[in-house]
């Protein structure tokens, strides 16, 4: 009788776990940086997890020929991404795009550099309210140093200025 209860419990746990919708998808390929700071990997648009990239003025990198122009965060991402990018998909958005934690310069022995953290520590992104604590700490450090968007006026779409 005891053996039967253990097997029944095991089967129940397996059924519950298999019915949960878990995003374990990982994409790894060359990434194209879109004007809004999203990435295009394998024909999928990926928003970087935990951050909002505010609109900034258009700048041009004239050290390249032809000059590369775009939002400051997009230019920073293009500078950082020199090879393949690996993204761990966290969720799918209603428009079909994905949200994920993306890493550049990764290897078998190193997970690489978190692109959301990279933008936050340079001041080109804002941590969302539900972002990890580390992201909020990086945002505060960039803000205290007056880096990136903290030197110019921006809109924070999730904060009501009339409160």
Segments from the language model and where they lie:
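Bacterial N-terminal signal peptides
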Residues: 9-19
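Small beta-barrel nucleic-acid-binding modules, primarily SNase/OB-fold domains
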Residues: 21-163
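Bacterial N-terminal signal peptides that target proteins for export
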Residues: 1-10
């Amino acid at each position: 009788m005891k053996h039967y209860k253990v097997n029944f419990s095991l089967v129940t746990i397996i059924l519950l776990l298999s019915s949960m919708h878990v995003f374990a998808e990982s994409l790894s390929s060359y990434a194209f940086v879109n004007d809004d700071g999203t990435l295009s990997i394998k024909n999928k648009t990926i928003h970087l997890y935990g951050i909002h990239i505010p609109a900034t003025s258009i700048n041009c990198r004239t050290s390249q020929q032809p000059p590369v122009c775009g939002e400051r965060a997009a230019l920073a991402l293009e500078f950082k991404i020199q090879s393949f990018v690996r993204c761990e998909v966290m969720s799918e958005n209603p428009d079909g795009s994905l949200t994920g934690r993306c890493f550049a310069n990764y290897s078998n022995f190193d997970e690489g550099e978190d692109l959301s953290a990279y933008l936050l520590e340079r001041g080109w992104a804002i941590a969302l309210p539900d972002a990890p604590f580390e992201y909020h700490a990086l945002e505060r450090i960039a803000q205290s140093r007056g880096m990136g968007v903290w030197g110019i006026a921006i809109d924070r779409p999730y904060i009501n200025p009339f409160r």
